[in-house]
A protein has these predicted regions:
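Edge strands and adjacent loops of beta-rich recognition modules
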Residues: 96-102, 581-605
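Catalytic cores of secreted or luminal carbohydrate-active enzymes
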Residues: 549, 553-595
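N-terminal accessory beta-strand-rich subdomains and adjacent acidic, glycine-rich linkers
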Residues: 26-302, 306
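An acidic-aromatic substrate-binding cleft motif
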Residues: 270, 274-353, 357
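Bacterial Sec-dependent N-terminal signal peptides
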Residues: 1-26
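Aromatic- and carboxylate-enriched substrate-binding clefts and catalytic-loop regions
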Residues: 360-543, 547
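C-terminal beta-strand-rich structural cap/linker in extracellular carbohydrate-active enzymes
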Residues: 661-687
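Carbohydrate-binding surface patches
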Residues: 599-635, 679-680
Length: 687
């Protein structure tokens, strides 16, 4: 492996209180374990570079911002004083995969002569920087230059922007399969979503993303050629450059089924700042063991702290969902569909199986109003009262546009009226769909909606949007879509002898990348399962690619404080022992341990809630034999309730084995995953 170390200039001096002299041109900060080192040079331009245990992760990559204030052009300015320190801290989060999050890092604070600060952090598992504007007057951000420069043409996992709404370049669903290709093969005319993974030598992964986004657009990237010449480097590499959606000036109703607000005119700037503001973090997560990505807390650490003083009313849980199964229930004496009897039935199913919620998806109201265009076949008051009696909350679907009216930044009155009305009725939350943008207006609107919902004790599930840090500030936002989830199986085409897309491979890629940014509403739980040769897309009677236990393992593997049961009550009742198992799995945890895994190949993870452990493994279409090391268990004997792929699962995907056995911390379980398969267990201490 080519190793390249960067050193501080001999001229650098350290002053009292951790301040460095302004005459220094280079500054270095290290992670607590010393493996991650960030070098910032501040000469003709400001650049950062990152190494991991001597390996070059990022070549010098420019940091720049272009501002305009009262017609005057401003920039980053020249670096003056620099403060350096090590920070050790932690915080609690009861709505996450672990109850306590460590936040230990090395920090540089670099102050410039144009009221800007560059904050740099080095963590044991990555590095990040952000710009902080000290300007108190209204300021336009014309552009921000954020680069991620790599010294070679490395392989990458790239989620491209696609499915643009009404042809608008920056209006899309944030859903994408991963193109696995060299950086040089990236489409230079296309934008990519982050997180995006770059595969470095010796198995090291560098994952590019943003974090802590607020009142600012989200980050996409595009590829560029990198040519560097100088004393330290003579290489031709590849570069990822940040791209931000320009600020919308005009917009109209359009997009999918006219549910979007689509910008028709954008400004020549990306953001408006109305005072001092910290801009989002530019992040590279670094791991040499893929499994560690599944337990990386970078997005949580760099997010704004919780802003809800009393969170005791927030109730994570599982939810029975109607849309994927097309309300196809049987053995009843009424016509199923968007009507009161159907949802009374869903409430009964949820109550019997100890599910906290049901969702009433699109169709309970009109597309233009949540207040005046109500479906006469739905008696909401009756459903709410019945749900209250049964201990089941109701979540309603809404488009983003329905909740905010026609003005993303002026919709507070609309959303407050709607949310107060339905909260007073007894509704527990909204699934907010078709954001399909992350420009500054939409990010600001997402925060406004979350704050409004919190005031009325409502939970939220954001669709058409990826997580960007808001979920820590407002934990009443349970979930985000922005994932190629189970819904895609309804329209997945066949090509040749199988489906067009390799869904099982995506299922063991997204947890490493998409889930790194935050929870994902994949909506698992298909009870109709198929191998490649027998799978086909079907809207009314959908199925999943891979085995039954592949689906069951998702409930432990995929993070979602609000986790869907996507199939119909009929299917779940026909497979009651699978349903009983799924219903026992929590949606938030006290501890997470990653046991094994390989990006795009398989996952093996353990999570603890109280004294009970939940363990799961998933694979792509490649069958695998793995060992589950149970040394994480405490002393004594435990009882393991296990679902494993059946002997014939490679032919009949619904085939499974249900095993109960005694285990202890000294055991290593040999498990077999069938093609597209899974394995999952609940392990409880003997009493």
């Amino acid at each position: 492996m080519k190793r390249l170390r960067l050193y501080l200039m001999a001229a650098m001096t350290i002053l009292n209180g951790g301040m460095m002299a302004a005459s220094a041109a280079e500054y270095e900060v290290s992670s607590p374990n010393g493996k991650v080192k960030v070098m910032v040079t501040a000469e003709e331009a400001v650049r950062w570079s990152v190494t991991y245990d001597g390996l070059t992760v990022l070549m010098p990559s420019e940091i720049k911002i272009s501002l305009q204030q009262a017609g005057k052009s401003l920039g980053l300015g020249k670096v003056g004083k620099v403060a350096k320190k090590q920070v050790k801290s932690s915080f609690e989060n009861p709505f996450y995969r672990k109850s306590t999050v460590r936040d230990d890092y090395g920090q540089l604070l670099m102050y410039t002569n144009q009221k800007m600060t560059i904050e740099v952090r080095a963590y044991d598992d990555g590095a990040a920087y952000r710009l902080i504007s000290g300007h108190t007057k209204p300021t336009l951000v014309k552009d921000e230059l954020a680069e991620f420069c790599f010294e070679a043409d490395y392989q990458a996992f790239v989620p491209y922007v696609n499915d643009n709404r009404s042809g608008e370049r920056y209006c899309y669903s944030f859903e994408s399969y991963y193109d696995e290709q060299p950086l040089s093969a990236m489409f230079t005319d296309s934008l990519a979503i982050t997180p995006l993974a770059v595969c470095l030598p010796d198995g090291v992964k560098a994952i590019v993303m943003d974090a802590g986004v607020e009142n600012y657009p989200g980050m996409m990237v595009r590829s560029e050629k990198l040519k560097v010449k100088g004393e330290k480097y003579k290489v031709k590499g590849e570069k990822l450059r940040a791209v931000f959606a320009p600020y919308p000036l005009e917009q109209e109703i359009g997009g999918y089924d006219r549910l979007n607000l689509v910008p028709t005119k954008r400004a020549d700037y990306i953001a408006k700042l109305n005072g001092r503001q910290a801009l989002p973090w530019r992040v590279v997560v670094i791991t040499e063991r893929d499994a560690d990505i599944l337990n990386c807390d970078m997005a949580q650490r760099l997010a704004p702290a919780c802003r809800i003083a009393d969170t005791s009313w927030i109730r994570p849980g599982k939810v029975a969902w109607d849309w994927w199964n097309n309300t196809n229930i049987s053995g009843v004496n009424f016509t199923s569909g968007m009507n009161t009897n159907t949802y009374l039935y869903y409430i009964d199913f949820a109550a019997k199986n100890h599910l906290e919620y049901i969702i009433i998806d699109e169709g309970w109201s009109g597309k233009e109003s949540l207040m005046s265009e109500l479906n006469p076949e739905i008696d909401l008051k009756r459903l709410i009262a019945y749900g209250l009696e049964k201990g089941v909350g109701i979540i309603l679907w809404s488009s983003w546009r329905n909740l905010i009216g026609s003005d993303p930044l002026g919709g507070n009155a609309v959303s407050d009226q709607v949310m107060k009305h339905y909260a007073d009725m007894g509704i527990k939350g909204f699934k907010v769909d078709f954001f399909d943008r992350d420009d500054q207006q939409v990010i600001a609107s997402a925060y406004q909606l979350a704050a409004c919902a919190a005031r009325h004790h409502l939970v939220l599930d954001y669709h058409g949007l990826k997580p960007f840090g808001i979920q820590r500030a407002y934990p009443n936002i349970f979930n985000f879509e922005g994932v190629k989830g189970l819904e895609n199986s309804k329209w997945e085409p066949r090509v040749g002898d199988g489906p067009l897309h390799n869904q099982p491979r995506y299922d063991v890629t997204a947890p490493y990348l998409r889930m790194l940014a935050g929870p994902m509403d994949y909506t698992p739980g298909a009870m109709s399962n198929a191998m490649k040769d027998s799978f086909f897309g079907n809207n009314d009677h959908p199925m999943s690619q891979g085995t039954r236990v592949h689906q069951m393992a998702m409930y432990t593997t995929f993070e979602a404080p609000l986790q869907m049961l996507a199939d119909s009550p009929t299917k779940y009742m026909q497979n009651q022992e699978c349903t009983d198992f799924i219903a026992q799995i929590p949606t938030t945890f006290d501890e997470t341990i990653t046991l094994d895994g390989q990006l795009g190949e398989y996952t093996l993870i353990a999570r603890r809630k109280g004294t009970t452990w939940y363990v799961a493994a998933m694979t792509d279409w490649t069958p695998r034999d793995l060992n589950v090391d149970l040394s994480f268990l405490g002393p004594g004997q435990y009882q393991a309730d296990i679902f494993a792929d059946g002997v014939n699962a490679a032919k009949e995907a619904t085939d499974y084995q249900h095993i109960r056995q005694s285990v202890s911390s000294t055991d290593r379980l040999a498990i077999h995953l069938s093609s597209g398969g899974g394995w999952t267990a609940i392990i409880r201490a003997n009493r």
